[in-house]
């Protein structure tokens, strides 16, 4: 039995979890900063860092209390050390280093994107390797071939804006509240996704990259020409814009799956909480014999520490250890 306590502070959630054997979350505590950043319409890095300083130890204490496991029952401390906001990452890294030293436990640094890729192993039915992983968040839109824990190959990524960024910036153009992706998803449920024709957010050619800047620009031109609508017309606009983003994600993911002969697709990252993306990916998988799609519960799509504990557990089992010189790497590539 391997029990790992993990800390996640890469952006605006302060999170801590205790996970057993990389499969069972004994606790999973998340302190969100949505209310703090809402007035600014997005995450303010300095405010995020300051709030992490205040919240990190109370969140750790709560995670330990909920798990029923004390420091003596832990095998290691894992922490997100990149990528992310450097100030936010530093808070988590310093806390994890202090705890590992105080408790005499091994320390493991974890890539935040790997955490998303393995979050599905906390679900009731986990995927098997190999699988195609689509990580979609506010800062990342990437396709990975996952051949085993710690064994990933980047297949494609966004050339400009991430899908989550396209949602958030689109919502800001429409005067919707933060977080924008959630607001668009909610309104889109009442709208017609075919009401407005947006350009395909797909890079032409055989590669597996994405591009969302043109779609965002198309929304800007639409708003400049027609203004921001209200009522049903706003719902139609949200549904159409969302559909263009979702269509690009699903088409590229399944193109990669067919070309590279993957039978399993894992959706991960905050945008994987989008209801239309979840439905579209599930429906597309049903069209292909032998194709399965794995989507973690919504709470495991958004930033959390349980997924970091999963990745940290397997890094520990591979013999990986971080020393006292572990530092934040805001641009760490997986």
Swiss-Prot record:
Q: What top-level branch of life does the organism fall under?
A: Bacteria
Q: Provide the binding site for substrate.
A: 135-139, 168, 181, 185, 274
Print the keywords alphabetically: Acyltransferase, Cytoplasm, Iron, Metal-binding, Transferase, tRNA processing
Instruction: Tell me the residue numbers annotated for binding Fe cation.
Output: 112, 116, 303
Q: Where in or outside the cell?
A: Cytoplasm
- Which cofactors are required for activity? Fe(2+)
Q: Which GO terms describe its biological process?
A: tRNA threonylcarbamoyladenosine modification
Q: What is its EC number?
A: 2.3.1.234
Entry cofactor note text? Binds 1 Fe(2+) ion per subunit.
Name the reaction it catalyses. L-threonylcarbamoyladenylate + adenosine(37) in tRNA = N(6)-L-threonylcarbamoyladenosine(37) in tRNA + AMP + H(+)
For this record, an example GO cellular component is: cytoplasm
SUPFAM superfamilies listed in its UniProt record: Actin-like ATPase domain
PROSITE patterns associated with the record: GLYCOPROTEASE (PS01016)
Which Gene Ontology MF annotations are present? iron ion binding; N(6)-L-threonylcarbamoyladenine synthase activity
The record's function comment reads: Required for the formation of a threonylcarbamoyl group on adenosine at position 37 (t(6)A37) in tRNAs that read codons beginning with adenine. Is involved in the transfer of the threonylcarbamoyl moiety of threonylcarbamoyl-AMP (TC-AMP) to the N6 group of A37, together with TsaE and TsaB. TsaD likely plays a direct catalytic role in this reaction.
**Which family is this protein grouped under?**
Belongs to the KAE1 / TsaD family.
Q: Name it.
A: tRNA N6-adenosine threonylcarbamoyltransferase
Q: Which organism is it from?
A: Anaeromyxobacter dehalogenans (strain 2CP-1 / ATCC BAA-258)
Please name the taxonomic classification of the source: Bacteria, Pseudomonadati, Myxococcota, Myxococcia, Myxococcales
Gene expressing this chain: tsaD
């Amino acid at each position: 039995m391997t029990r790992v306590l993990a800390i996640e502070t890469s952006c605006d959630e302060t999170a801590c979890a205790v996970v057993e054997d990389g499969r069972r979350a004994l606790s999973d505590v998340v302190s969100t900063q949505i209310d703090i950043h809402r007035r600014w319409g997005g995450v303010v890095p300095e405010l995020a860092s300051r709030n992490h300083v205040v919240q990190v130890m109370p969140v750790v204490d709560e995670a330990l209390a909920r798990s029923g496991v004390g420091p003596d029952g832990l095998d290691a401390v894992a922490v997100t050390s990149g990528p992310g906001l450097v100030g936010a990452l530093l808070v988590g890294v310093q806390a994890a280093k202090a705890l590992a030293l105080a408790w005499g436990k091994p320390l493991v640094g974890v890539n935040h994107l790997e955490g998303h890729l393995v979050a599905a192993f906390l679900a009731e039915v986990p995927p098997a390797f190999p699988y195609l992983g689509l990580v979609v968040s506010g800062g990342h839109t990437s396709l990975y071939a996952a051949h085993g824990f710690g064994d990933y190959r980047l297949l494609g990524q966004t050339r400009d804006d991430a899908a989550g960024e396209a949602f958030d910036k689109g919502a800001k153009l429409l005067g919707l509240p933060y977080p924008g992706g959630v607001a668009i998803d909610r309104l889109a449920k009442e709208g017609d996704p075919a009401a407005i024709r947006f350009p395909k957010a797909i890079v032409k050619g055989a590669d597996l990259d994405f591009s969302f800047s043109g779609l965002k620009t198309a929304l800007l031109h639409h708003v400049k020409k027609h203004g921001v609508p209200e009522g049903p017309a706003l719902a139609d606009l949200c549904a159409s814009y969302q559909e263009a983003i979702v269509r690009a994600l699903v088409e590229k993911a399944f193109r990669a799956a067919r070309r590279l002969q993957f039978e399993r697709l894992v959706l991960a990252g905050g945008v994987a909480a989008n209801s239309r993306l979840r439905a579209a990916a599930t429906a597309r998988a049903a069209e292909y014999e032998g194709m399965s799609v794995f989507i973690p519960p919504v709470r495991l799509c958004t930033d959390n520490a349980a997924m970091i504990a999963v990745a940290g557990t397997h890094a520990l089992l591979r013999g990986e250890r971080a020393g006292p010189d572990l530092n934040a790497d805001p641009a760490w590539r997986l």
